[in-house]
Every structure is written in C-alpha cells, then in structure tokens.
C-alpha cells in the first residue's frame, strides 16, 4: 500500500499538481501565485474568507504584542489566560463545555482513548475522516473491537447495534457531519432517532467542515440539524471557516470535559495553541456572535446555491448534491483526475483532487471548495471553463461521460449541445481481439507453446477445470473461466490470457495473524470477507497467466486493451477486485507504469520456489551446492530421518485411498494462513487421480502408522515437475519432520524421472531452500474496485 501510494503521489508531484508552494509576497484574496503564475484558488477550506478579516488580524497583532509568539508550556501545568477566554466564548456559542485543543486531530487522540472504555465497541463510518480512523488504532491496541459500516448506511448501523448491544457496555458510532471527500452530510435525523431508541448507542462526530458557515452563530452543520444530545461528543475545527487555529471538543457534561482535560495524552504531552492564534480565535468567536455574522452566512449561502445551480445548468455531475461548500465532481482513475487538474491550471484555476486511498482507485474526482473571497463571477467563469476541460480531459484519457455514469452509478449528464465527437484510434486497425469462453476454442499446441514451460495454465488443465468448476452447489466452486487473445494483422499472438471470475477470500494475501483472525470468524460465517474477483489464471493453477510478446510494437496497446476488457467485465459482474499475476521482476519493470495509469497497483506475491539446477548426480552432489547453513539442515533434519520412512510412488486407486489422500490435503488447508483460498472440491481430486500427468508420492512411517503420513501431488508438464498440493497427518508431521521429508523426496523423484526443473510453488521458503530451491521474485498487479473489505480487514488488525 505505502509503495503504491508513494508512486501515485510522486507521479502527481512530477506533473506539478501536488506539493506546490505559493510564490506570493502577499496573499490578500482568493488569488495565489505558484511558480510565478497567477491562479484563482478553489482549494481553500476557509469557507467564510475570514483569514483576511481586519478584526482577526488586529487581534493577532495585539496578542503577539502582549504575550509574544509562543507560550511553551503543557496545558497540564499552565495555560495562558487567553485559553479561558476562548473556551468561555465557545461555551456561549454551543451552550456546552468546550475544551480547546491544538488541532482537531490532537483532540481526537486526546479524547477517544479516555471516552472509550474497556467493554465498549466502536463502529466507524467507511468515509469517516482519516484522523478518527487513526485514533481508532489506539483503541484497537487497547483491545476495543472496531467495526465498519458502509457509508451513511443506517440500516447496517442498526443491524450492528442489535448484534452488539447485549455484550457491549457502550456502542460508539463515529462519523463526520460533512464528509471531506464527497461533501455529503451524515443522516443526522436518523442518527438522532437511533440515539433515542438504543440506550447503549453514543455518537462521536467530527464537524470540522460544517463549522462556521452554517448554524446559529456558526455552530455548524451538526448542531443546525439537532440539539446536542446527552450521548454525543462533538469535535470541530477552529481552522477552516473559523480562520484561527486548533480544534474544540464539545461535551454533554462537565464530568466528561474534566476527565479528558485531565487524562488526554495530547493535553499533557503536546504543545498548546500559541498566543497569536488564540487571539485570532477569540476575535473569530466574537464575530460569530455579532449581528453582522448572519450577513456573512447569507452571502455564502447564496454562493453555494449559485454553484449547485450552475453545475446543473452546465450538466456537470456531482456524486452527491448537497448544500455544503465542498464539491466533488466524479472522474475516475488518478491519471484522469490529474489530466483535468492540469488543464484547469493552464486556464488559471487551482483545484484539488480526491482519490486513492481516500476513494476507491476508479472513483477519484475533482474536489473544489468555494469561499466568501470568491465572487459569483469567479465561480461562474471557473465552472464554465471546467465544463469544457472536464470533457476534453476525459476523452484524452480514453474515458467519457457515459463511462463516469456507469462507474459512479449516477444519472446521465452533460448538456447534449456541448457533447463532442471524438475520434479514437480503433484497435482493430492494429490488431484483432478474440474473447473466448472455452479453451476448446483455442488450438492446444499454440496455447501450450506459450504457457507449458511457465506453470500449470496449460490446455489440458484448463479443460479439466472448466468441467469441474461449474454446476456445483457451493458458490465458491462455480468459476467462469474465460480467454482473451489479441493477434496482429498477420495473425501472430501479441497477448493471450486466461482469467477467472470467482468468489475469493478477501484476505488472499493478508498477513498470517490477520488471516488467522478471519479464519476464526469464518467458523460462524463461512463467507465472511469474501467477494467476487477477477484473477488471471485460475484459483488453482499457478505460473504465467498472461503471455505478452514484448517484441511486437503494439504490445502496450494490447495490454491496455486486455485490462480495459477486464474492467468492463468487472463492472458488469459486480466484481470487487482484479488481480493480474504472475510476473517476474523484468516483466514487472516493463509493465508497471502502464498498469499504474490504468489503476492497478503492484503487489508483492509470495516467492516462487524453484530448483532450476538439476545437473547434480546424487545427494552429496546436491548438498555441495547448498550453503553451509542449508547443508547442515538437510543432514540433520532430513537425511538423518530418511530411514524412518517408507516412500511409495503410486496413483491412488481404491475409494478409501483416494478419500484419505483428500483428507490429508484438507488437514493442510485447514491450517494454512499464508495464502487464503477456499478448500478445493473432491471432484477436482478425482480428475487428478485419473490424469496420467500427475505423480503421487506417499510417505509412511515404518513404526508409527499403517496409513500414509504425507502425500505430494505433482504434475509433470513439458518435463517440468510441478508440485501442486501437499497433504499431512499432523499427528506425526511436526515430530517426524514429514513436510521437510516429502519436499526432499519430491526433489529426488523429479531427478529420477529426468525432469529439467522442479517448481515447488509458494510459501515455506526456508524449508524449500534446504532441498535446493531458490526463491524467485513474483509480482502481481491489483485493483480494488471497492474499499469495504480492505477497511474491514484494517479494523481487525
């Protein structure tokens, strides 16, 4: 995640969109200069434009003259008297105990670990601000359960409350009043109803973007919609509309106020707001309580109304139309958003982006804010310009209004008189594409020539899997295996791919401890954290799943076309994730830039463990090629115990033998947390038992058991020995080192059969190195089309 985010941000920095500095000697309006160029700034959250208020600036000067630039003492020991004046003024506005903090984020970090106690439970809205999500991690460290609901889904919230109320002391719902990405509102009337109906429900709500511009005396959106409930803590900002510094926590009673002030970590260990900005805060609070303040709000309300009206007239879309000053225009992938922002900059307008990871990868957009420093004419001209640049930018990136409508599931938009015809380069002029629903439609020799040396996605395997994974009772055992080939005008294959639409576990590649927790939760809900995925290859096969002819001059266009096809199929099939696999490091380097622009992020897959040097003559020769560490391990852990085992190479024939082999596999599957996949059906094993390309190795303990204690199921493909599945009896596995022993016997078997290479598949790197395997870097590229499962898994960490 961090590496992918770094690449996305750095791309935007390199394109001159992010991490810029103003070059103004003085800023006195909504205009800013960046690199010497003037822009009208629509990226400011100072909604009422009070940063240029003479009253506030004079207060800053006076406070500085009286108290200096800082008063550097923890509030636990001593606060400058301006704090008391500011908190008293805020109390008059809100009629609730007010605790001023150095920032809204520091307020969350101070309050939440004190308010949320042992036995409580937290429910987060999916879109709640990052600062609350970060603070929730502290609660998780204190063993507080964290749950997440879809954005503004009150039915899901009530369902969670009913589920948790018997065991929880308190249930804390955490939300925003005005959400910072989409500018939409929390459904406060419904939340208030739930607070009244469920005694254990409590509300912690951040109204940073609602403060000032609305509500009586500017007390914000939340308090404009409901009274301060006696089970509600309100956090808001003294930045943004308030134009000062810091945050404020509003409590329903003095006891909560006292406890957070006494015990909140950032109240003790963080620095205070400094005198100049305390002066600004006091002046702003006085202004909020003045007769003229309502005029500022009314003026701003007219601008919000005008902006919504103008967007509608121009046919520009909004994800959620509200009366907030924060607007989100749906676009799509990050590269599309950046294209439009760059175009708007060239026209003299500075807008923000909203994208991954705050939104799903394909659901980024333009984010702009209006404020009282803007005139109606400023807003009108910016939106008129945006209408044109929005469409041109979409088309330049291969998108369209229709695509945005489909992706965001919003109503069709754009004034028909403005709609432009675009002339895209048609792919059929450079290659032909074939979408196939069965491997039977593809010549086996041609297909295997591309794939047989690189894993198990070979013709005969795919033919079997098509038969096995259809018409089954279990959802996870019904796969749609499809094929996509792209040929140039001479008929040569430029790209060939097999891909599968299947129900998969969302923790497929999650860390072991997290997968272990999820595995426990699946004992109650078998399909917990599962979703429909598209992955290249199949959930059973491994190795190369996309062939690309990098020598063909059109390979990049072919790859883009393939990804676009997968994304279209994902949209039509309610797919949550797309995973392209498996690529070596050189391949990854060639394609990562293209795929990142298409919204797919690099994923480090488990190493592939391969014995590719088969020139050794005997065990001593094999051992001589290992490092000293692994020579010792092979001798002491494996060869020393080899005499305890009988080894048989046979195909399971009788029903009992076949079923027992399956049981040994199930033992391993039930213990595995490194790669989370569904248990394979017995139906597949029956195909394997009958397939002459499969080789079976059984281990028996000479003195301990009449039944095999381990089995390795491998497939020989084009003289490569592919270890597919292992089975173990855990009554003996650890004591006798059965897994290590069967790995060694697998290597010996492949050598005996004259195979040129052994593919020992993924995981258990250390054990496989002991028998001569070398780890090969293995990469994938993934796109999460929705955030829900990712956020849910984060809450379980």
Where are these regions (language model features)?
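Conserved N-terminal alpha-helix of the aminotransferase class I/II PLP-enzyme fold
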Residues: 58-104
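Conserved PLP-anchoring active-site segment centered on the Schiff-base-forming lysine
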Residues: 114-130
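A conserved beta-strand-loop-helix scaffold within acyl/acetyltransferase catalytic domains
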Residues: 426-517, 567-568, 576-734
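Acyl-donor binding region in acyl/amide transferases
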Residues: 480-482, 488, 494-495, 501-599, ...
